[in-house]
Structures are given as C-alpha cells and as structure tokens.
Amino acid sequence: MALFSFGSPAQRFAKKFNPLRDTVYDAGGMFSGSRMSADLAALQPLAEAVGAYSAELADLLWLQFVVYRKRQLHTEGLPLGQRALLMREAKGGLTPTERYEQHYALGESALEAEDYDTAVEHLQQSAHWAEQEGATLSLDQKLGIREEIGYALHEAGRFAEALVHNQQLLADARAAFGSDTDVRLSGLINNLAQNAYELDDTAQAQHYLQQRLALGQALKDDAIVLDTLFQQGVLAHEGGDSALARSLFEQRVAIARAGGDEDLIEEAQATLDELAEREQQNS
C-alpha cells in the first residue's frame, strides 16, 4: 500500500478545475482573462490524463471557449468550443436545451469571428434543438435565431439561400404575430430587400422596400420611413433616375422637419445636398 495517496487523475483535475469554473461562472465575479486562459491551458495535460475523450477534457475545453469569448477572442476560442461540443454529443446525454444553448453560443461566437459558414451550421443546429420537446424558448427567441441564420447566410455570400430562408421566415413571422403591421417585421423585410439587391434583382428589392415603407407609415415610425426612403433613393440614383431619387430625398427632409429632430433634419438635408452635388458633377 502506498504511504501517500494523491487521488485519481479525475480527482486531481476536479480539485484544480472546479474553483476556476466557479470563478468564471460567478455573475458578480471578476478575474484576469489572460491569467484564467493560462491557468486553464495548464490543466489540459491533467484532463487528457483522465481520458482523451473524457467529460473532464470536454468541460475544460468548453470553459476555455467561454473565457476566450468573454475576452472577445472568438477566433481562438471557437475551435475549442466546437471540439468540446463534439465530444459531449458523442457521449450523449445532453438535453435539447443544452444542445440549443451550446450550438447558439458557438454560432454567436462564429458571427463575431466573421466565420459565417460556421455560424450558419451552429445556428441551424440551435434552431433545430430549440423546436424539440423540453426546450423552453419563447416564440420571439425562436424567430430571432432564424433571423440570425438569414443574416449569416447573407454575410457568407449565400444570397439565394438567404432570400429563400427569409421569405419563409417572413411568412411564418406574419402568421405568428397575426399581423402584417408588427414592427418586428421591419428588419426582416429589410433583409429581404438586401438579399434581392445582392442578387441584382432590383425589382424585387424595390418590392420589399415598398412593403417596409408601408409598414413604417402604418406604424407612424419615422425611423423606418426615413431609412427606407433613403434606400429607395439610392436604388433610384443607381438606376439612373435622378428625379425620383431627388423626390425621395426631399420627402426625407420634409418628414424630418415635421418631426422637429435637428439631427435627423441635418442628416436628411446633407443627403439631399450630396445628391445635388453628384448630379452637378455628372452634368
């Protein structure tokens, strides 16, 4: 019998790891991100001694991902989080909520890293698990995940996929909200206009912008109206219809003046002046 017992590798790992984990997840706690990353990296040989596919190693890798995410070092942390989740999924036992949350965290981190294809992959998985029994998400949260998928598809340059995705999402959102004039539809309709624009389908882009303008007018939401008129003006200018562009920008100035917001008035007037200057240069 050994004179001294130092415990199993799992016990030795837990003794060092658990206090670090508790510190990271303490909502009111403070710690040095770089020091925490170094302390966790130093534990990797001990976690690997427990097993190359052990729960301990998966937990360590995930916590490293969490810390890197807090430090906004998404490119560094993302591969660690992905590896951890693969190990956890291989072992089984994750609840739908855990799968939704972890895929969502990876998707959000991938967005921050501008790794949009990876973001699509994890956000789609998150949306899938969010629909399973036992996952407790509100309707707005579920639709929000799907809107982020559309954004990631667009940023990945997958414009046709983004358009189809967002068209279905718009139909589902209208049905869920029971209204065509819910302010939550504004961003989605705008995304569709952007998808169509990138596909060089100006007519469809104008169609969606007109829908968004009507929504803003119905809601009496000057922010939506002013932004949409600006986009319509840009499309008109790019299409060579300077008279229409000028008319749309003049409408923006009139609406801004009626609202009395000096910043909006200044911005709308500056846009109109810039258009006039460009017209003069091109004449």
Please state what every model-predicted region is.
Residues 242-260:
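TPR/TPR-like (Sel1-like) alpha-helical repeat modules
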Residues 1-103, 283:
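Flexible inter-repeat linkers and adjacent short helices
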Residues 34-37, 75, 117, 160, ...:
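Residue register within tetratricopeptide repeats
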Residues 25-29, 59-70, 98-112, 140-155, ...:
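Conserved alpha-helical positions within TPR/SEL1-like repeat arrays
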Residues 49-53, 90-94, 132-137, 175-180, ...:
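Short coil/turn linkers that connect adjacent helices within long alpha-helical scaffolds
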Residues 7-14, 55, 97, 137-140, ...:
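Residue signature of alpha-solenoid helical repeat architecture, marking inter-repeat boundaries
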Residues 36-43, 77, 81-84, 119, ...:
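Tetratricopeptide repeat
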